[in-house]
């Protein structure tokens, strides 16, 4: 077994020549010159080898140095393998050459010791004799016998944990052997960890275990400690002062020690049971999150370096009058605040105080604020002077009855018009229409204000579901009434009841066939629990504003019914009807996309009116069978005749061009395929799996990644991150291409076999 106290060869630093320090550490300088030698999956391991070679530990031997060079050669692309040389000009000479064959790092061993040269510096080491080593080891009080400590830790393990502790020890041995600085002990079900871990470890990850505590005497040079999702109830006051970042989210911590690591810069304690914070938090702290705890008050003086403070979802009734001067983000939503400090930090950019009890905002807010969320409070007015940098303000669900008179003249500093969201406030319909006319004028350059139509002063009483259904199905038998009464226990049944009552007040009830349509649909819902569950969910927010939102929700329910029928086999023997159903869903998706474009260009207009307006007005020209005929507020939707003409043309062109590809990837069609052509479906899926599991997929990814020629960054970690992001994006793109090819092929074959392939031809002339 490996024992760190049983060392075969050691060295001591003898002399340094050319000692002028460089701005870039040697390991980074070398890495920046050779990072292109390695693929993205080998970058981290190669970087660790370079770090070791630039600063060999005192235990380095020729064999260990050689093993690192051999490892680098194996990891490198074949074209660069010869740039990493060992046994060059002698058994104990090693070097790395840059792309232009310039020597950038060399290590030379001799009988006296070894020399490391790189970056214009030369460091020489001499070996310690065996007797010196023995004397040093016997006289050292700090030598740690890791194997003894770890073996005892494994012996103490409960039976169900023993195997995972062995796995943890293997990972720690690997860190020792390969000089790794990151130790991952995630998801091992550990109830404790040993106090002694390899001293070179700077990142310790203990997430998703069953730890109830951390060691009081945790050793090492840890800079980053993650112990999220455990069962911790406290934090030792003796954690290493080297820790700079600590995440202990989703635990059971009830209090913090008065002393935390002095170097701590980032502390995340999301979802614990903390009731108060220590008065003296570390002065270096920059990020503090105690989101979702039970804190009632904050210290009067928080560290001055904090730039991000998240105290959301606690029990705070007030914030400190003096907040850190450099604070840029303050998240204090879901508390019991009734006011804000009179003076907020001058550099504040993000302020979230939503879901509180605030009645008034400071008349002057910091001009640097770009994002302001004061929704779900008790505000009756907004400040006349909004922050100059404001980009988005969320003020929904307050008691606002008017907007600042200065609002139309406000000019934000951002590249886009400021968005001010004031939905679900008690504005009158007349006030909303006046604002819409003002903000829709040609020369208007003020903020874009979003609101919801409707009279919010009306309070509706939600009836029991069976009574709401009887309003549509007047001749229900007692047995049917009892059936709907039983459905009242299902999730969101009350929301659906309110929806039905509100639907009866919409413009569409003027048409007799509308009631017949709804009645038939309700009878279907009574027989289909899965469809009923989907419809009840859609009803959740259907009645929170105007009747047009109710109508839009009804459209969504009809669309969901159509998809449900396709998935459950209603069209298995009627593929022509399935394709027509798919065409309707495709057209509705296109309408939604165009409506979103229109919403971006309008001011003071409820987006519900825009979405419903396009659906309603294009109902006949696009043969939309699931859409109703009428809506109430089309006159304030902002949609013009030219908008409708353009939308119709664009949607028909898109359908002729793209429906074939869209239908091939449509989920309900796949469900039909599995039922009507199970053998062909299995063969196609096997072919798809083969594409992924063989070299074809990775070869295509590598080829496109190579074409990108991602430039090296002076920040090696940043370069690796960019390459990983690019590889992920390319992988998704290629997977989509593979899916499109295979799903299109099987679609064409099955439709041809069923003699309905002509239905995929261009629909519009």
Curated annotation (Swiss-Prot):
It catalyses: S-ubiquitinyl-[E2 ubiquitin-conjugating enzyme]-L-cysteine + [acceptor protein]-L-lysine = [E2 ubiquitin-conjugating enzyme]-L-cysteine + N(6)-ubiquitinyl-[acceptor protein]-L-lysine. Its EC number is 2.3.2.27. Residues 1-453 are annotated as: Interaction with target proteins. Ubiquitinated in the presence of host E1 ubiquitin-activating enzyme, E2 ubiquitin-conjugating enzyme and ubiquitin. Residues 462-765 are annotated as: E3 ubiquitin-protein ligase catalytic domain. Signal peptide: none annotated. The active site is at residue 546. Keywords: Host cytoplasm, Leucine-rich repeat, Repeat, Secreted, Transferase, Ubl conjugation, Ubl conjugation pathway, Virulence. Residues 454-461 are annotated as: Linker. The keyword Secreted applies. Residues 464-758 form the NEL domain. Pfam families: LRR_TTSS, NEL. LRR repeats lie at residues 200-219, 221-242, 243-262, 263-284, 285-305, 306-325, 326-346, 347-368, 369-389, 390-410. PROSITE patterns: LRR, NEL. GO terms for cellular component: extracellular region; host cell cytoplasm. It is an enzyme of class 2 (transferase). Disulfide bonds: none annotated. GO terms for biological process: killing of cells of another organism; protein secretion by the type III secretion system; protein ubiquitination. It comes from the Bacteria. One of its GO terms (molecular function) is ubiquitin-protein transferase activity. SUPFAM superfamilies: L domain-like. Effector proteins function to alter host cell physiology and promote bacterial survival in host tissues. This protein is an E3 ubiquitin ligase that interferes with host's ubiquitination pathway. Can ubiquitinate both ubiquitin and host TXN (thioredoxin). Leads to significant decrease of thioredoxin activity and increase of host cell death. Interacts with host TXN. Belongs to the LRR-containing bacterial E3 ligase family. The LRR (leucine-rich repeat) domain forms a slightly curved solenoid and may mediate interaction with target proteins. This is E3 ubiquitin-protein ligase SlrP. It comes from Salmonella typhimurium (strain 14028s / SGSC 2262).
